[in-house]
């Protein structure tokens, strides 16, 4: 059996992904990175609706038979973002064990307490993440760009205490997350999207706002100041974090001394507004932006 130092996590006690029996459902990039990360830390089993297509022998030997899943008692189930709990082969099993479902973001948070900027929203996530990453890199931060942008968060290597993360998070990832926290959270905008997955607009909005729900006092959330769906949700709930409303239409106040043409294009003005507000909170060197 595995033996690791017990690690306490503020708010949730001991690390819940050490020395456990874990099922990873979905063998795309996210699922495979979770397997590689956890395989020497816990007893990990794999399943995918299309597992018969898997050729890698190291992966195949960890795949559990469909029938054996129902005979097993798992401590945690890590669900890949692409798995729709209502349409997959293990739908009934997952609904019965909903309290055991976690995301790769949760696994990351259990092992690392690094500062993160986590960006979500209906539009502009990738552009804003890339821009934030470039700015931090230019200012000599040890920074990783991960998440829905294409690099699974658990595939990050050479992580130090000072490593800073820029994370693109989709509603699918956040929907399954339970314990993940980010010191800096960003909701760029919200409009009806992925309703075929979330079933209702309200559930889609709630998934996005999980990012703020788990934040603590001393954390910061940046949101579009005139977004109707965002403001409605803010009125309905109280959050421990400090809410910073970003005026995306008054970009001129940020650009007085900026010559970078990227910031001046209309398409990037809204994204740039968020980046400037976050940079201000991080006390970044304005000359280098």
What are these regions (language model features)?
Residues 44-49, 144-145, 166, 245:
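Short beta-strand "acidic-cap" motif of Rossmann-like dinucleotide-binding folds
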Residues 16-20, 25-27, 80-81, 198-205, ...:
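Adenine nucleotide phosphate-binding catalytic loops in nucleotide-utilizing enzymes
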Residues 20-21, 36-39, 69-74, 81-221, ...:
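Phosphate-binding loop of NTP-binding sites
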Residues 29, 123-127, 269:
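Residue-level detector of alpha-helix initiation sites
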Residues 1-103, 107, 284:
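N-terminal leader/targeting and accessory segments in enzymes
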Residues 51, 167, 285-289:
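Short alpha-helical "patches" and their helix-cap loops
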């Amino acid at each position: 059996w595995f033996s690791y130092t017990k690690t306490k996590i503020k708010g949730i006690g001991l690390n819940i992904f050490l020395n456990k029996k874990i099922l990873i459902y979905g063998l795309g990039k996210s699922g495979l990175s979770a397997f590689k990360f956890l395989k020497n830390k816990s007893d990990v089993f794999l399943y995918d609706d299309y597992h018969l297509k898997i050729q890698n022998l190291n992966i195949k030997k960890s795949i559990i038979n469909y029938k054996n899943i129902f005979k097993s008692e798992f401590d945690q189930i890590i669900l890949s973002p692409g798995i729709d709990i209502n349409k997959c082969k293990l739908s009934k099993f997952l609904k019965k064990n909903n309290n055991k479902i976690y995301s790769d973001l949760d696994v990351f948070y259990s092992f690392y307490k690094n500062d993160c900027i986590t960006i979500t929203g209906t539009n502009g996530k990738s552009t804003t993440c890339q821009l934030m990453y470039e700015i931090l890199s230019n200012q000599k931060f040890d920074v990783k760009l991960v998440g829905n942008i294409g690099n699974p968060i658990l595939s990050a290597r050479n992580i130090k205490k000072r490593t800073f993360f820029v994370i693109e998070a989709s509603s699918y990832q956040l929907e399954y997350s339970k314990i993940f926290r980010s010191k800096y959270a960003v909701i760029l905008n919200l409009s009806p999207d992925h309703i075929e997955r979330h079933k209702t607009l309200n559930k889609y909005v709630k998934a996005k706002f999980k990012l703020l729900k788990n934040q603590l006092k001393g954390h910061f959330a940046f949101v579009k100041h005139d977004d109707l769906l965002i403001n409605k949700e803010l009125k309905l709930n109280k959050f421990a974090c400090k809410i910073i409303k970003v005026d995306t239409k008054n970009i001129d106040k940020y650009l007085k001394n900026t010559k970078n043409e990227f910031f001046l294009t209309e398409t990037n003005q809204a994204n740039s507004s968020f980046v400037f507000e976050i940079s201000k909170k991080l006390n970044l060197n304005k000359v280098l932006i």
